[in-house]
Amino acid sequence: MTKTFRNPQLTKNGELKHLLSIEGLSRDMITHILDTASQFVSLSDSDRDVKKVPLLRGKSVFNLFFENSTRTRTTFEIAAKRLSADVLNLNINASSTSKGESLLDTINNLSAMSADMFVVRHASSGAPYLIAEHVAPHVHVINAGDGRHAHPTQGLLDMYTIRHFKKDFTQLRVAIVGDILHSRVARSDIHALTTLGVPEVRAIGPRTLLPSGLEQMGVRVFHNMEEGLKDVDVVIMLRLQNERMSGALLPSAQEYFKAFGLTPERLALAAPDAIVMHPGPMNRGVEIDSAVADGPQSVILNQVTFGIAVRMAVMGIVAGNSD
């Protein structure tokens, strides 16, 4: 008898109860998240007196960041508070996990404190899946980045940003540039872009920083920056993740910038109205020139702003679905 595989992110009715990866989400589901996020963008308006909605009132959200983060943790905290949730940020270095307590023991103890949602960043790929399999049916898990595997909310906010500026995914050429081998953002972006119907996704980088199997994912591979950027509509720059590299994969940061840094001259090879994105943190003078990062085609700060609304949408959607 054939065993039926069920996506662990979904309820029996196919609704989103956890967000663990963009892989496996339908185009309709991704579009629903983006549409929901658009309703929350107005809450960020500086002219708005009331910036909260009561969607998660009475719910407890635990931010569990086992890796350092500023941008992601802060935007999740703001998102949860704007949904009226009670938020607890666990200080991992001061917690029992640094004294040898297992991940699941930590989850059990926090669940006993009536946690309703865990937002998890972990160095081990698959850690959020393990937690999602372990928690009670009413508890929700959102992956805020696991190892090299996935960063689904970053992928979704990138798609929101692209849709905001470019409207139609089916008419775009998108280039992802840099350390794709170690990038969970790149994996999430590629799955989202192909699911949303982008006809041409390009990966640009040195051979040592591009994983095998990109072509099987429908990605065109370039090892020359000038060739890869020609006529693209969106450029997504990635930082060098030196903390995940084992061994000398590059000669030097200066040599990398010389070959793959995004300069105004190289950006001129893209479409005239191309936008430049970066998930952060940026390494100026390594993967991107300051003139580009701060230039008129950069939408990097828009990504940060939209990230709050997208994370509000994800939290609101999963909180409404349980088995």
From Swiss-Prot:
What do we know about how this protein assembles, alone or with others? Heterododecamer (2C3:3R2) of six catalytic PyrB chains organized as two trimers (C3), and six regulatory PyrI chains organized as three dimers (R2).
State the organism named in the record. Cupriavidus pinatubonensis (strain JMP 134 / LMG 1197)
Task: List the pathway annotation.
Answer: Pyrimidine metabolism; UMP biosynthesis via de novo pathway; (S)-dihydroorotate from bicarbonate: step 2/3
The record's family statement is: Belongs to the aspartate/ornithine carbamoyltransferase superfamily. ATCase family.
Its GO biological process terms? 'de novo' pyrimidine nucleobase biosynthetic process; 'de novo' UMP biosynthetic process; amino acid metabolic process
Q: Which GO terms describe its cellular component?
A: cytosol
Q: Which reaction does it catalyse?
A: carbamoyl phosphate + L-aspartate = N-carbamoyl-L-aspartate + phosphate + H(+)
InterPro entries linked to this entry: Asp/Orn_carbamoyltranf_P-bd (IPR006132), Asp/Orn_carbamoylTrfase (IPR006130), Asp/Orn_carbamoylTrfase_sf (IPR036901), Asp_carbamoyltransf (IPR002082), Asp_carbamoyltransf_Asp/Orn-bd (IPR006131)
**Keywords, ordered alphabetically:** Pyrimidine biosynthesis, Transferase
The name of this protein is: Aspartate carbamoyltransferase catalytic subunit
Alphabetized Pfam families for the sequence:
OTCace, OTCace_N
EC number of this enzyme:
2.1.3.2
* Origin superkingdom: Bacteria
**Protein role:** Catalyzes the condensation of carbamoyl phosphate and aspartate to form carbamoyl aspartate and inorganic phosphate, the committed step in the de novo pyrimidine nucleotide biosynthesis pathway.
Q: List, alphabetically, the PROSITE patterns matched.
A: CARBAMOYLTRANSFERASE
